[in-house]
Amino acid sequence: SLDHAIQGDTLVSPYHKSDDGQSLRQFDFVVSNPPFKMDFSDTREKIAAFPARFWAGVPKVPAKKKESMAIYTCFIQHVINSLKKDSGKGAIVIPTGFITAKSGIENKILKQIVDNKIVYGCVSMPSNVFANTGTNVSVLFFDASKSNDKVVLIDASKLGEEYKDSNGLKKVRLRDEEIEKIVTTFQNKEAVDDFSVAVSYNDIKEKGA
């Protein structure tokens, strides 16, 4: 067991609630690494019973490959709801395809976070960089202060070096200098050829978010 770690279902029975138990507690910082390829079919209807929390909706369970349900969209909504109003910051691991979604729950969330200027950055990571999934993932960053005028988009998918984990499977890890490059570029919102851009919220809206 881990000190200060609590096991449970944060979507159905969130541990951190307001004193009256009717809403989520809000925090200065929230991070989330949602489970990928896990079957949530048994709890889908329980999650859907909270429409105020899951304002963009709850994805349907696929008839085949139930574990491919886009449950991460619920975790995005949970993170946003858990940010302290006007000051909270958050980050969440998502499938890279989310940021180009043109319909469905994904697009509803994109419109909300762009229209409200909550999202302020996204870093697309190399394949096989996460231990528990081969899915291409990105890290999405939120800032409830709405103080940013641009969103920084970084493509780090071509970075990293291959190695084999303890099971002999090929994985990718970022080198120290690559991590430094990502952090510096993100903080400075720099535009770097073939690596990053900083775009206004209006530009994102015009392109369909």
Predicted regions and their residues:
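Conserved SAM-binding strand-loop segment of SAM-dependent methyltransferases
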Residues: 2-10
